[in-house]
Regions:
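Buried hydrophobic residues that stabilize the cores of well-folded domains
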Residues: 1-248
Length: 248
């Protein structure tokens, strides 16, 4: 697969979503009415985007000490997320009751699941997620923040088992140039790295890290290779106990 081309295609969709919803980050057209709410769940111990219901099945293996968390039957002092589902069982809102609180509005368009994360007070769009699904399982997932960092993941399943994944850390060098220039003024030691990132860019997108993951169920291992133009390339294996599909 030409991942560079796929990333550019999806980047265009992400850019359109940012442009369309920048001034309407909690769109009324996709809000869940109280009368249409089917159930509410809570979760604790969540250290991933969207917590227990994060669309990515492999973030735990790439970022250390990242946990999906645990569902709770009711809200407690330890609850980090509140999830609201429609009557068809589709997740429609993921709420973090922090200070300030955040809400992710979630809906589906064709094979795509779109998520907009925004602050609830003086609404500001913070993160856009895009997930492409074949049946219930994702073939692609992207999380893009309002800065220039984007996280692209491509998956290959064999039935219900995840066999391999490609994860790309991508910088959009055309986004928030003023912020980048301000950072360099205060941290001139980053100039060399920024220039190396710019040299990697194709159509404004620079792949700074590429993790390839292969899951061997029989051997009980996850093989990970990191190819990075900015850091040392590495290979390693980790114990693999399988990935629950309960959240798909």
């Amino acid at each position: 697969m030409d991942y560079q081309a796929k990333i550019r295609d999806y980047a265009s969709i992400i850019d359109d979503l940012f442009e369309k919803y920048q001034d309407d980050p909690i769109p009324a057209a996709h809000r869940l009415d109280e009368a249409d709410c089917g159930k509410i769940e809570f979760a604790r111990g969540c250290f991933m985007h969207r917590g227990f219901y994060c669309p990515s099945p492999i973030e735990e293996f790439v970022i250390s000490n990242v946990r999906r968390g645990h569902l709770q039957k009711k809200r407690t002092a330890s609850s980090i997320y509140e999830y609201k589902f429609d009557r068809a069982g589709q997740l429609r809102e993921a709420i973090q009751p922090e200070n300030p609180p955040y809400v992710e509005t979630i809906w589906r368009e064709g094979n795509f699941e779109i998520g907009l994360t925004a602050t609830c007070i003086l609404p500001m769009l913070r993160v856009v997620t895009l997930t492409e699904r074949n049946s219930n399982f994702p073939s692609f997932y992207c999380a893009a923040d309002t800065g220039n960092r984007r996280w692209y993941e491509f998956f290959q399943f064999n039935g219900c088992e995840l066999e391999e994944a490609h994860v790309f850390d991508v910088k959009d060098i055309n986004r928030d140039k003023d912020i980048q220039e301000a950072v360099l003024r205060h941290c001139p030691n980053l100039t060399e790295i920024m220039e190396r990132v710019k040299a990697l860019a194709v159509d404004g997108l620079a792949i700074t890290d590429h993790h390839y993951l292969r899951f061997d169920k029989n051997a009980g291992k996850c093989f990970v290779r990191c190819d990075s133009p900015l850091h040392r390339t590495s290979e390693w294996t980790a114990p693999y106990k399988g990935i629950s599909s309960a959240f798909f």
